Structures are given as C-alpha cells and as structure tokens.
Amino acid sequence: MAQAAQKPETPTSPATRARVFASRSLASLEEEYGNDRKFIWSVARALQILQAFRLRDGAMGNNELSESTGIAKATVTRLTHTLTELGYLKRDSSRKYYPSPTLLTLGYTVLGKLRVRQLAQAGMQEIATASNASVALAWPEEDTMVYVAANAAPGADGLLLDVGSRVGMANTAVGRAYLACLPQDALEQKFARWEVLYGADWPDLRERILASIDSVRTDGFCIVEGEWRSNVRAVATPIYDADHQTYMALNCGGPSFVLDPVRLREEFGPRLLHLAAKLGWRSPW
C-alpha cells in the first residue's frame, strides 16, 4: 500500500516552530558570534545536539540530528561519538541515540541553586490541590518557558509536564505573564521575530498577547484558553527571582472541564498573585 504523502513543512508549521523554539539556529549564532574569536563552535554544536532531543520522544539517529539542528552529518557523527564516550548519550538496539541520566547531574546543579524554587513548592502544591490541576514555575529561555518546578493535585497529573519541559512563550499564559515584565524594546524584538515565524497567524496572535499583557499589568495575572492545547485553560502571574535578578512566571493549568474560568479569575489567579508577593515581587512597570 502506498504511503500518503507527508505534508510539507512551511516557515510557520509546528515542526519548523519546534526547531526554532528548541535551540538557537546556526544562522542566529553565526550572526551574533561570527566575529567572536573566544566563541568555541564545537561546544555550541554539542549543546545543540543535546537540545535537539527535546523536540521529540524516542531516540534519534545522526541523520535526524543533522536535519533537526542544521549541523553537517559528518560533524554530528563526531559529536554523538564524543558525547556517547563521555556518558551523556546512550545508543538503543537500533543504534540511535538518546540522552543518558548522566545529564541530570548538570540539571540538578542548576535546580539546587534556584532558591525561589524551594520557597515556592509548598504554596504551589496547595494551589494545585485546591484547583485539582497542576501548578508550575517557569524560567524564560529564548522564545520558550522552561519548567523548573511542577506540582499536581493527587490523581490529576495527566497534563503535568516534567521539570525541564518547554512550552511556547507566545501562546501560553505562563509565557505571556513573563512577557508583561519585559521593557518595550525587548518586547518589540520578540514581536519582530515572531512576525516572521508565525506569518499570517501573527496579527491575531499579537492582539491576544497584548490583551494578556494588559491583563497582567491591570489585574496581576492573565488567562489563556485553547491556544497551547485546544482543551486546556490556564492562569499565570509573573514572579521575581531576586537571587538571579530576573523575572519568571507561575501558572495553574488543566483541562477546561476541570478549571472553571470564574474560579480561575476569582480564586486561583489571586492565589498565584499572593504567592508571587510572598516570594518577593518587584514590579517592572
């Protein structure tokens, strides 16, 4: 039986966006660091290889890694060999690569230094239990938000993303809560990049982002429904990490049939806002 033709990728297709969100492209790195003699390209490419595994489940071969990162296959082959020898990658029975638990030693060091993460845990769990949903703390990275803490109500972990998971910044409540803290010039830089990335979808998306930003600056939080996933709604508020002098965001999210929009606005949004204040809120506006 002939296989159906695969739908080609477009500049704004999910697959293309995933590559943009997962790691900085070679072109962007070359544009920024092409004249930097101290910049070590082999290190940058090795890190891009490791980041590529966040794009999909399962193991990846050298061809897939080359296509995903834009790095030449010969270079990928040398990098995967080196990373395997160092213990950061393993190979499965099909000889494809997957990340080794050895990588956790690097991540654990990062999490251990995020004091705000430890301070937020008890309050996050209380809100998760009360909402029968999940609560997460996310750190900004490029055009994504990376989960550094996640809690769920007992038996309600179906949508809980693990620590280290990424969600888009433009189409989530947690991302827009963070965007509300950016100075105007930084916000416009992101908008200029997203205009290209999202194409025809951008004008409407931009208006929704601006509405969410206005909500955060007026009410302290924003609610987004059906944009990250069609059946999910969430509320989020910014949080200030004094140790690292940076803004992050807290969200409470779950299935639409579980999280009533009225309770999100009247109960869980204010509770997230209260938790952010306890942790040391600092207004950027």
Model-derived segments and their meaning:
Residues 2-113, 117, 125, 277, ...:
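N-terminal helix-turn-helix
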Residues 33, 206, 230-231, 246-285:
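Juxtadomain coupling helices with adjacent low-complexity linkers
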Residues 98-193:
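Amphipathic alpha-helical effector-binding/dimerization core
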Residues 129-130, 226-231:
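Short loop/turn motifs at secondary-structure junctions and domain boundaries
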Residues 233-237:
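Short hydrophobic beta-strand micro-motif common in sensory/regulatory domains
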Residues 239-242:
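Sensor-regulatory modules in signal-transduction proteins
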